[in-house]
Amino acid sequence: MKMFTLLYLLTVVPGILSDVQLQESGPGLVKPSQSIALTCTVTGISITTGNYRWSWIRQFPGNKLEWIGYIYYSAITSYNPSPKSRTTITRDTSKNQFFLEMNSLTAEDTATYYCAR
């Protein structure tokens, strides 16, 4: 089920919302025990548009993917149980952005982080 959800998040149906773009920004590197704050800016659609989940995923060295969590168009959040206690996803609808904050990072959090719809 997790793989299906991830594939769905990464799939864009041709011709539907094809002009939607997501751009991550934040610090390149952080040290263990520090926190990270990432921003995803969405263009081409409002993040309050119905029935969309705005997600954060990460890709570990070796290409393993992990879903971190999402914020629903209605601001409901859901998290992967693994990093849940250290993770917060929020949004700013006035800027059409959503955010990932993770605390108490360890070497095991080394990954490339992506936002996705």
From Swiss-Prot:
InterPro entries: Ig-like_dom, Ig-like_dom_sf, Ig-like_fold, Ig_V-set, IgHV. One of its GO terms (biological process) is adaptive immune response. Residues 1-18 form the signal peptide. SMART domains: IGv (SM00406). One of its GO terms (cellular component) is immunoglobulin complex. Residues 19-117 form the Ig-like domain. It comes from the Eukaryota. Disulfide bonds join 40-115. PANTHER family: IMMUNOGLOBULIN HEAVY CHAIN (PTHR23266). This is Immunoglobulin heavy variable 3-5. It comes from Mus musculus (Mouse).
